């Protein structure tokens, strides 16, 4: 969790300029015949904000970060449930949590992200499921390549109002930008698996909390890929476009390209 920056409960992180770039959160459980009910999580490739933490972004970039979650090479044995979660390639906002303090249960509010400028771009989430026989259920989740907003977390993206003389291009350049982020998922060698699925959701923002947007550019976050190796695997893609096997790179109208890890 938090390949570049980790903000704890009660912490405040402010970004005014510069880059958080080229980081990754990576998880790959090792092979094991006796392992059961195993999940693999990778969250917050660039920035992970705990419940109770705050991230203020006034400028700069969170770019080219990634979360990668894998499970593979599990041998035959008892029925198992395997899930690979890859969430928040750029930024992960943890949802509200319950903690016990002096015997009492206390609710910690979800993380808060305030963005008034800067760019979240070319981040990626990628999840892959590998060899597994006799599994009852297996799902790969690749969600929120730009920003993942957990339950109870709050994401405020609000650019300044432009004067009436500004052109559309000038206004867009001044707005906070969430662009060219990508999600991808894959299950391979799953011929014995039932009830398998790939979920790819929210190339720009995955919202399970509260998102407030005003004067922002959220565009070209529709690059995603999902692959499967047998007819028993279901593919679910929401608000993204499907790219067939072998087509891992897309070229946008401005000449820029994005490629899955």
Task: Label every PLM stretch briefly.
Residues 1-261:
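Surface-exposed loop/turn motifs in large extracellular/passenger domains
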């Amino acid at each position: 969790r938090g390949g570049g920056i980790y903000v704890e409960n009660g912490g405040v992180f402010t970004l005014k300029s510069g880059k958080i770039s080229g980081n990754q959160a990576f998880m790959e459980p090792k092979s094991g015949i006796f392992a059961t009910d195993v999940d693999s999580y990778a969250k917050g490739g660039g920035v992970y904000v705990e419940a109770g933490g705050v991230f203020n972004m006034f400028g700069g970039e969170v770019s080219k970060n990634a979360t990668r979650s894998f499970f593979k090479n599990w041998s035959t044995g008892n029925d198992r449930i395997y899930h690979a979660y890859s969430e928040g390639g750029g930024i992960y906002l943890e949802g509200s949590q319950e903690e016990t303090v002096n015997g009492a249960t206390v609710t910690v509010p979800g993380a808060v992200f305030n963005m008034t400028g800067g760019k979240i771009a070319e981040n990626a989430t990628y999840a892959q499921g590998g060899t597994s026989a006799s599994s009852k259920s297996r799902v790969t989740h690749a969600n929120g390549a730009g920003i993942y907003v957990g339950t109870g977390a709050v994401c405020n993206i609000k650019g300044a109002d432009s004067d009436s003389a500004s052109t559309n291009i000038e206004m867009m350049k001044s707005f906070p930008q969430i662009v060219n982020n990508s999600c991808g998922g894959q299950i391979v060698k799953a011929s014995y698996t039932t009830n398998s699925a790939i979920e790819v959701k929210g190339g720009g923002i995955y919202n399970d909390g509260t998102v407030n947007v005003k004067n922002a550019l959220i565009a070209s976050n529709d690059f995603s890929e999902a692959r499967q190796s047998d007819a028993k695997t279901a593919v679910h893609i929401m608000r993204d476009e499907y790219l067939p096997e072998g087509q891992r790179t897309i070229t946008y109208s401005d000449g820029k390209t994005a490629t899955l890890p």
